[in-house]
A protein has these predicted regions:
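A detector for small-residue-rich transmembrane helices and their helix-helix packing motifs
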Residues: 2-3, 9-230
Length: 230
């Protein structure tokens, strides 16, 4: 699910110290450092890419790449369910990795600080796994059994969908992340995904839907907890 290089210019303008209003506890929080789970996810993805790159020295195939990638045809013949998870942390080259991690640093920091590390991590993993499962169904339905898919963008779209839901349900929740900005970011990504070949648009769309649904569930639960004084 490779991301176009245009993301670098778009999101580089967004990576800066931000402030947003936390309506759940009435505090203002400054994003002046990267939250721990977001940072760990970025480090893990970079570490895996380094190992893959070392394994490909001399034109060889990386054993780790073969172990983690989600190859549709092979998965259908012999379902190795862990690949629905491992492929979320695997990328096809440094450009693919850099584009995804740049977005994750920004959106992940917002989501993790707003919702807490465990809710954030849960939505990230559920969105990524769900996006991969949907991708298997989609490519089998299309007859594209030779497709191999990997990347964090399904999970990242889940975080974008989560934030979109929260912004819609609590107007003005984020001072620096507006509804218009989120919609533009997602539309921009999808547009270039459909305009270019080799992009897993199914993962993007399904990831966003899963994240949005998770956002509804989390928002309602947090409102309930606040009403009950918990």
């Amino acid at each position: 699910d490779g991301q176009p290089s245009e993301f670098c210019d778009l999101y580089a303008t967004l990576i800066r110290k931000e402030r947003f209003s936390d309506r759940f506890n009435g505090k203002r929080i400054a994003i002046n450092r990267i939250p721990e789970v977001t940072l760990m996810l970025v480090i893990l993805n970079i570490l895996i890419q380094c190992i893959v790159a070392v394994g490909e020295i001399g034109g060889k195939e990386s054993a780790l790449m073969n172990m983690m990638v989600l190859q549709i045809g092979k998965f259908v013949q012999k379902p190795e369910w862990w690949r629905l998870v491992t492929s979320v942390f695997l990328h096809f080259g440094w450009d693919h990795l850099f584009n995804n991690m740049l977005v994750l640093l920004y959106l992940g920091a917002l989501a993790e600080r707003c919702l807490g590390k465990w809710r954030f991590l849960g939505v990230y993993l559920i969105s990524g796994i769900g996006a991969n499962a949907a991708s298997v169904w989609w490519y089998v339905h299309q007859g594209d059994l030779l497709v191999a898919t990997a990347g964090a963008s399904g999970a990242i779209f889940g975080i974008a969908g989560l934030l979109l839901c929260i912004v819609l349900l609590s107007k003005g929740h984020f001072e620096e992340i507006t509804l218009r900005q989120l919609i533009f970011m997602m539309f921009f990504t999808l547009y270039h995904g459909f305009a270019e070949s080799g992009v897993n648009n199914c993962a993007h769309i399904v990831g966003a839907i899963i994240g949005f649904v998770c956002g509804i569930i989390i928002f309602c639960q947090m409102k309930k907890n606040r009403a009950e004084g918990r």
